Amino acid sequence: MGIHQNSPLIDAAEVRKLHALTGDALVAKQANDEALAKIIKGEDKRLLLVIGPCSSDNEEAVLDYAHRLAQLQEEVKDKIFIVMRVYTAKPRTNGDGYKGLIHQPDAEGDVDLLAGVKAVRHLQSRIIIETGLPIADEMLYPSNLDFFEDLLSYHAIGARSVEDQEHRFVASGIDVPTGFKNPTSGNLNVMFNGIYAAQNQQHFIFNGAEVKTDGNPLAHAILRGANNENGQNLVNYHYEDLVKALDKYSTFGLENPFILVDTNHDNSGKNFIEQVRIVREVLLNREWDERIADTVRGFMIESYLEDGRQDTPEIYGKSITDPCLGWAKTDSLIREIHDRL
């Protein structure tokens, strides 16, 4: 067998003792989880923003961003609830490239997954302790869930993972909101089948044991655009796309209809400045159609300190993966959203 064990077995219970939340930070985490659940259920009508860097590659830059975001959250909290993207594991189209903090605690260093697990917990706990913000990460590796679930208030299932049965079944055992992206093909049925699986009880083998889940009624849809066989972007944030998606909730008989629009990726063609225009169009459609306003109640936005991206981490606060909105544009956009709600 070509899989070689490079470390002793990792004890998840011991991992969770590293940078564990206590006191005020734990209370804040619990309050954020409760608020998020109410938003997904429609009991709290604030708009949800899941926003932050494409990848959390530099602890100090990410914390700098987090402190700015937390200050802005205080100013807009009457209409907007912010969850910070703290993405630490990155899917790669062909397996090459920077795979996130969990793989490389130093973005220019060697792969060290054990150090990466510690670095992820250190960063995510610092954000919660220092800012009180709830945080989101992509569940790229379901087997890693036990290492971080006590810190996360939101999980995302990516476009490349949404068809995978293990991702769907593990999501059915998560007790906080879990967003399912449409696959890169754009097939909405694939995404909604995933949400259906996650909202229902499942039985399977996980971490070496037979398990049964409760089902996750907070599983929901994220529209991120698509890419056809010729490499062309196919967007799904226009009026007719939103109507089709919200109709699927009835077709599949799902609980808590809720849709986030991912403003980057194939919706923007990774042209980061397009995120501003996409938000404006969706807000206009919410104003036009009450059904859209009731269901499309959030955005996922890629944002960092500096505009754009770079190949190597030379400029502080600039993405080394997908291009992001810089802070000045982010601040302006969030204030604009607040004013229009």
Where is each model-derived feature located?
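Internal helix-turn-beta structural module
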Residues: 303-341
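Short acidic, Gly/Ser-rich segments with clustered Asp/Glu that frequently serve as metal-coordination loops
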Residues: 54-57, 256, 264-270
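Glycine-rich phosphate/diphosphate-binding loops that line cofactor/substrate pockets in enzymes
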Residues: 37-45, 251-256
